[in-house]
């Protein structure tokens, strides 16, 4: 009995992104730079949306919620990863692994649904502009955010208890840099094929539901844009939607590779590389993709920077 308890609740060992990195401090500096850039850029975007009245619209409200989710998402994984890189002590407790596993699933699921519902916002803005204030009222916006978090939480509450109840009586070494589901299941000494099939169906549903909303919304948007007579209106509509489509393609593409494509088609090293892309790089890229081509956001940033420079000059004088 003692051995059984130990096999279930003992600590795990995270092997990391690169198990045998030749320059660990260089890797640490790179990951830290990406982490700080991600946190700073998302915080700046949230502040700009909050203080600039021109950005008090449903679209920017949803973007601020996406930034908040990205901050929580990257903070769930990267700090532990950085500590492991510096201390060379890669152990993570069973409780810590469970918490990380739950938060990762919840936040990832919330992003799937939020990106899907954000396409509905674009559909209403372009296809039904006269009804936009009613169809995207503040109440509707909060319902969209709540629905996204609820969808993600269901994923976390369903999969986490089942994944963590398997007896891990083989090696305790997780060939990953965080407690991701496929890497954890490889440590189980019981047959997990039935659960993996159920998880596969669950992941398909988690992707299919928001992806259906995205496909339907952008099909209607393309039809509406095609019928527009003014070139300026077309350009503005395309520019508004292109950033969202880039983010959707990056996040959904990486998730489909990891959870939908059969595991025989990719190696553990490839899994870690793809996971690093959508857990570390995507939270940094999202604010850049949405902001660089957005005149409202860049204008708000220039306005704030101008105020800071002016106040600095006055103080110095």
Swiss-Prot record:
The chain crosses the membrane at residues 23-43, 61-83, 98-118, 140-160, 198-218, 245-265, 272-292. Disulfide bonds join 97-189. One of its GO terms (molecular function) is olfactory receptor activity. Keywords: Cell membrane, Disulfide bond, G-protein coupled receptor, Glycoprotein, Membrane, Olfaction, Receptor, Sensory transduction, Transducer, Transmembrane, Transmembrane helix. InterPro entries: GPCR_Rhodpsn (IPR000276), GPCR_Rhodpsn_7TM (IPR017452), Olfact_rcpt (IPR000725). Residues 1-22, 84-97, 161-197, 266-271 are extracellular. One of its GO terms (cellular component) is plasma membrane. Glycans are attached at residue 5. It is a multi-pass membrane protein. It is found in: Cell membrane. One of its GO terms (biological process) is detection of chemical stimulus involved in sensory perception of smell. SUPFAM superfamilies: Family A G protein-coupled receptor-like (SSF81321). Residues 44-60, 119-139, 219-244, 293-317 are cytoplasmic. Its main location: membrane. Belongs to the G-protein coupled receptor 1 family. Odorant receptor. This is Olfactory receptor 2T27.
């Amino acid at each position: 009995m003692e051995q059984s308890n130990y096999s279930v609740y003992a600590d795990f060992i995270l092997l990391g992104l690169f198990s045998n990195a030749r320059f660990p401090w260089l890797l640490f500096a790179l990951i830290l730079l990406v982490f700080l850039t991600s946190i700073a850029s998302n915080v700046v975007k949230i502040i700009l949306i909050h203080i600039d009245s021109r950005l008090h619209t449903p679209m920017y409200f949803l973007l601020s919620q996406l930034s908040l989710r990205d901050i929580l998402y990257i903070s769930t994984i990267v700090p532990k990863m950085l500590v492991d890189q510096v201390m060379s002590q890669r152990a993570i407790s069973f409780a810590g692994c469970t918490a990380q596993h739950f938060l990762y699933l919840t936040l990832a699921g919330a992003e799937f649904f939020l990106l899907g519902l954000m396409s509905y916002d674009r559909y209403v803005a372009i296809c039904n502009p006269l009804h936009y204030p009613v169809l995207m009222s503040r109440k509707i916006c909060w319902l969209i955010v709540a629905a996204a978090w609820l969808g993600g939480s269901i994923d976390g509450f369903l999969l986490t208890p089942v994944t963590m109840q398997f007896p891990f009586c083989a090696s305790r070494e997780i060939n990953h840099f965080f407690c991701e589901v496929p890497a954890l299941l490889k440590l189980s000494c019981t047959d997990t094929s039935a659960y993996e099939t159920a998880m596969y169906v669950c992941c398909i549903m988690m992707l299919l539901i928001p992806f259906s909303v995205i496909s339907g919304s952008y099909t209607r948007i393309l039809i509406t844009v095609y019928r527009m007579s003014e070139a300026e209106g077309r350009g503005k509509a395309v520019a508004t939607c292109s950033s969202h489509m880039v983010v959707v393609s990056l996040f959904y593409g990486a998730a489909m590779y990891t959870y939908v494509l059969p595991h025989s088609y990719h190696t553990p090293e490839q899994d870690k590389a793809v996971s690093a892309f959508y857990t570390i790089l995507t939270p940094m890229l999202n604010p850049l993709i949405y902001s660089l081509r957005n005149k409202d956001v860049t204008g708000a940033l220039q306005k704030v920077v101008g105020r800071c420079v002016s106040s600095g000059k006055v103080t110095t004088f």
